[in-house]
Amino acid sequence: MTKKKKIRVVTGGVFDILHVGHIHFLKQAKELGDELVVIVAHDKTVEERKGRRPINSMYERAEVLKALKMVDEVVIGEPNCISFEIVKQLNPDIIALGPDQNFDVSALKEELKKKNINAEVIRIPYAYKSDVAKTSKIIQKIVETFCE
């Protein structure tokens, strides 16, 4: 009897101040396959892309994600880039993009093809809409509540 190949889903993000929007996204990503691997953005990447340091370090964010039952593995990304080398090593069947991740899906698919990464790219729609399901909104609310 042959063993059925497990479907590996890979996603990535900052995941700073984990909130309900992250949880809904990760649950949906996990439902796409058997294993969910999360690439946590390197602190330097967060600074470059968001214009601020993350509240929690990449190690703290990774530890929190590892504690979630839907997450099977966590990898910390390379500084200042999206590492296709890490993605290639993880050998995903599916790459799950969050609804607010500003990737050009066509360009991403083309880049994956160039790197010989044969993964389907799926953008997960918002499952939970709320003003507090966004890290920047949570930070803003904290500042307004405790710093004014």
Curated annotation (Swiss-Prot):
Keyword Transferase assigned: yes
Family annotation (SUPFAM superfamilies): Nucleotidylyl transferase
Entry's EC annotation: 2.7.7.2
Pathway stated in the Swiss-Prot or TrEMBL entry: Cofactor biosynthesis; FAD biosynthesis; FAD from FMN: step 1/1
GO BP terms in the entry: FAD biosynthetic process; FMN metabolic process
MF terms in GO: ATP binding; FMN adenylyltransferase activity
Pfam families: CTP_transf_like
Catalytic activity entry: FMN + ATP + H(+) = FAD + diphosphate
Family: Belongs to the archaeal FAD synthase family.
UniProt-listed NCBIfam families: cyt_tran_rel (TIGR00125)
Stated role: Catalyzes the transfer of the AMP portion of ATP to flavin mononucleotide (FMN) to produce flavin adenine dinucleotide (FAD) coenzyme.
Designated name of the protein: FAD synthase
Organism listed in the record: Thermococcus sibiricus (strain DSM 12597 / MM 739)
